[in-house]
Design a protein with these regions (language model features):
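Amphipathic, oligomerization/interface secondary-structure segments
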Residues: 1-105
Length: 105
């Protein structure tokens, strides 16, 4: 997977953890889930490339902080899913760990 870019790997991870991440994404962003995920991945890929290539004109905006929080939560979701923890338990864990004020159905 050396020739697969960060943005594509991020999209794959989001797809694999979609069920876990859905309530956290929906609590932060308006719009269709698929579109939102695509936008998060595109923005994070742009930021990553800007940092990797020392772009001094990189603009960080408030939405990037939300994106980074989602990525942080995604990392936990990926690890716990790999350990075969069930979706609801992962969501409850992320909610508690990150102090998310959302209800888990």
């Amino acid at each position: 997977s050396h020739d697969v870019g960060f943005g594509e790997r991020l999209k794959t991870a989001m797809a694999e953890c979609r069920a876990v991440m859905e309530p956290f994404i929906k609590s932060r962003y308006d719009g269709a889930l698929d579109v939102t995920i695509e936008e998060i991945c595109d923005r994070m890929n742009t930021v990553r490339n800007g940092i990797a290539h020392s772009r001094l004109d990189l603009n960080l905006e408030a939405v990037h902080l939300s994106d980074l929080k989602i990525i942080e939560e995604l990392l936990y979701a990926m690890r716990l899913q790999h350990l075969r923890v069930d979706t609801k338990s992962i969501q409850i864990g992320i909610k508690r760990l990150f102090g998310e004020r959302i209800s888990i159905e």
